[in-house]
Every structure is written in structure tokens, then in C-alpha cells.
């Protein structure tokens, strides 16, 4: 019961109900009990050391892990604002863009997808999704929840764009559920000829496959920190072109999410010329980690990083062939260089093999969505795109498969 006026309070205070409640509390009937702490919470946390060769997260470099241990700063302290500015420059570098609205969303790669969709789409818009795996399905599902008119196609044909006349076209560049890399040449040009914006998912490909946002005419691109960048999950790099920002500024309705509003986030990250406004408290330690991860890529060179992933992918294919194992993606030009999918041989339980490797301290993963039970997924992201490590993981995989085939 809430007393909204002084009169109501006085009436309640002198009422029979008040006297009954007072006696009830005095009797101890509603005395709060002291909860017993969970026994497991009082034990020391155990975190084993593993080689993470699944689809993400990947292993962190020591310098990235160390960066997270730095002193916390306030989210509006000038020193932290400088770190955010460095991070923005690093993201422009790896995306290969001059877009002012380039920053990181506080959340996983999935938050990047949601941020892109809630800003670029509103009711009445048409959304064309190129579906080459699970993440196209996910983008379509999110848009349908928003009340958007969604059309799904299997390939980015110009005819489909001209027929549906969408406001936004979605393409997943690196599809982690299948290990496919989607060529993007010419798609941006077709989109712009019809007035559409091109939205690209690079969660599994940024830094490990060839991508140039500006040269490809990409209007919005998002990614994640826990794949090739080798940072912890928790931030979603994202970039909006001037075309995309113009569409957002001219929406008929406000962006439904304050948290994901690109204009608000852009101001917080220093993307505009306005006085910085408080938006939310960024995951400060994770920003430290991302800034450090981007510095590692910059020191190697973004093109050198990408070339290394392509070269080591060739090594994987040779090792698979030598051990009578088959890549799931048949055409080499469609294979994602930083995540290889391998066919599970007939009669072999994929999970038993994965469990054998896990017992050796090495993680690989099974399929996702339509590929469940059909493939293994081997991520060679960032520092794990290494000749010695790759030889080790393929050797363990081949040995585990041979063991299962001979049972």
C-alpha cells in the first residue's frame, strides 16, 4: 500500500490496518531469513587452459589480456576519451573506411546486427536478405520482428535487387555456420543504382579475409572482437557511411532503441562535432583490450594479416587432403580463410571426435543450424593462424577420426 497524500498517510497510520500490520511485524512472522551463500561460489574459480580452434572466441594474446588489468578510468575521463579515439582510428583502419560514424557497440557481434537493423530499417521499408547460412536467417528473423517486409534470396543477383527495390540489402561476408566467404564485388554499385543501402556482416571475416568497406560501397558493416582480433567478446565494431547516416537522420520514426541509436552512440564516441553527451557506461576494460588488439593488427599490417590467413588456409587444405579428409566448401574461392569446415566421414560421430580433441586441450566445434552433425568447424583466427598450431590441430583431428573409423 502506497500513501500518496499526507491525509491518506494520517488516515492509514491511525487505522486498524496499520495496527494489525504493526503487530504482525513485531511478532517476527515476516522476519527476513539470512540466505546461505552458494557453496560453489565460495570455491576458487577454475579456468582451464585451452587452444580455442572453434568458431570463436579465439585465444587472446598476453598483451590483450594484460590490457584488461589496467586501472579503471571513468567513462568520460579525458584519458579514456583518448583511448576511444584511438580505437575509432583502429576500426577505420581494419574496415578500410573513412566513415566518421565508426565506433564499437557495447555488446557482442549480435548487438552489431541489431544496431544496424534498428537504425537502417523502419516499418514500410523492404529488406532483401542474401541467405548463405544461419546469419542471413537471423537477420531476416530480426527484421520480421520489427514488422519489416523481408525477402530472402540465395545469391545477390542484381535482378532481385531491381525486382524487390529494397531500402536495405543484407549480405554475410563470412558465414561461420558453413565456412563460406561471399564475394561482394559489384553488389554495392547495384544497390546504389536502385537507391538501396548495402549492409554487411563481417563478424567472422574482419582481418582474416579481403574486405574494403569504401571500395566495395558498403553502407553499414559490423563485426565482433572475439574472432580474428583475438580480443574478448563484448564489443561490436560498426561503421555507417554518409548515405546510411543520411537515411537515419531522415527517418519517419525515431529509432526504437535508445541504447542502439547510432546518432547517440556516434556522439558518445566522438563521431560528430557536438559536445559529447552521456549515453551509457562503456565496458572500459574491454575497450582497452580492443584498442590493444587493433594495435597488434596495425603493427603487422591489415593486408599482411589477411595474406597470412589465406596462406595458412592453403596449408589446412593440404593437410586435410593428406589425411583423407574433405573440406565442406568445394570451391576454393568460396572458402572462408580463417574458418575451415570439414566434412564428417560416414559412420563417425562428430561429437566423439571433438571430445577427443577437447581431452587434449584443443577445441573444435560441430556444425551450426543446417550443418549440425555434418561438419567440424575449425577456426584459425588471428594468432591461431599459425603453421605449428595448425599442424597440431589437424594431426589431432586425423588421429581421432582414424581411431573412430577403426573401432
Kindly give the residue locations of the regions a language model identified:
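N-terminal "arm"/small-domain region of PLP-dependent enzymes with the aminotransferase-like
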Residues: 31-78
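Conserved PLP-anchoring active-site segment centered on the Schiff-base-forming lysine
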Residues: 121-137
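Active-site phosphate-binding strand-loop segment of PLP-dependent enzymes
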Residues: 158-205, 220, 228
Amino acid at each position: 500500500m502506497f500513501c500518496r497524500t499526507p491525509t491518506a498517510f494520517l488516515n492509514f497510520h491511525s487505522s486498524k490496518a496499520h495496527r494489525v500490520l504493526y503487530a504482525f511485524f513485531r511478532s517476527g512472522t515476516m522476519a527476513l531469513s539470512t540466505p546461505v551463500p552458494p557453496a560453489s561460489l565460495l570455491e576458487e574459480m577454475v579456468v582451464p587452459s585451452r587452444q580455442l580452434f572453434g568458431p570463436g572466441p579465439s585465444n587472446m594474446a598476453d598483451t590483450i589480456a594484460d590490457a584488461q588489468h589496467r586501472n579503471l578510468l571513468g567513462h568520460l575521463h579525458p584519458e579514456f576519451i583518448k583511448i576511444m579515439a584511438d580505437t575509432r582510428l583502429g576500426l577505420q583502419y581494419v574496415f578500410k573506411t573513412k566513415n566518421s560514424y565508426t565506433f564499437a557497440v557495447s555488446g557482442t557481434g549480435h548487438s552489431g546486427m541489431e544496431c544496424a537493423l534498428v537504425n537502417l530499417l523502419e516499418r514500410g521499408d523492404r529488406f532483401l536478405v542474401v541467405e548463405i547460412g544461419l546469419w542471413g536467417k537471423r537477420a531476416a528473423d530480426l527484421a520480421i520482428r520489427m514488422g519489416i517486409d523481408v525477402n530472402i534470396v540465395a545469391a545477390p543477383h542484381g535482378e532481385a535487387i531491381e525486382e524487390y527495390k529494397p531500402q536495405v540489402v543484407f549480405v554475410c561476408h563470412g558465414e561461420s555456420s558453413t565456412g563460406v566467404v561471399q564475394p561482394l564485388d559489384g553488389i554495392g554499385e547495384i544497390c546504389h543504382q536502385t537507391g538501396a543501402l548495402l549492409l554487411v556482416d563481417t563478424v567472422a571475416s574482419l582481418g582474416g579475409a579481403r574486405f574494403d568497406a569504401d571500395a566495395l560501397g558498403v553502407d553499414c558493416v559490423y563485426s565482433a572482437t572475439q574472432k580474428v582480433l583475438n580480443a574478448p567478446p563484448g564489443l561490436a565494431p560498426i561503421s555507417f557511411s554518409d548515405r546510411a547516416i543520411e537515411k537515419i537522420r531522415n527517418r519517419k520514426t525515431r529509432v526504437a532503441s535508445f541504447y542502439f541509436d547510432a546518432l547517440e552512440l556516434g556522439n558518445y564516441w566522438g563521431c560528430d562535432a557536438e559536445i559529447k553527451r552521456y549515453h551509457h557506461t562503456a565496458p572500459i576494460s574491454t575497450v582497452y583490450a580492443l584498442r590493444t588488439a587493433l594495435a597488434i593488427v596495425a603493427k603487422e599490417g591489415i593486408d599482411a594479416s589477411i595474406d597470412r590467413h589465406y596462406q595458412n588456409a592453403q596449408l589446412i587444405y593440404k593437410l586435410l587432403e593428406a589425411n583423407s579428409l574433405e573440406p565442406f566448401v568445394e570451391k576454393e574461392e568460396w572458402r572462408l580463410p580463417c574458418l575451415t569446415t570439414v566434412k564428417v566421414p560416414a559412420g563417425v560421430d562428430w561429437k566423439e571426435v571433438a571430445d577427443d580433441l577437447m581431452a587434449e586441450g584443443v577445441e573444435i566445434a560441430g556444425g551450426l543450424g543446417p550443418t549440425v552433425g555434418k561438419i567440424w568447424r575449425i577456426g584459425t583466427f588471428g594468432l591461431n593462424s599459425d603453421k605449428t598450431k595448425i599442424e597440431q590441430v589437424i594431426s589431432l583431428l586425423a588421429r581421432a577420426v582414424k581411431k573412430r573409423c577403426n573401432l
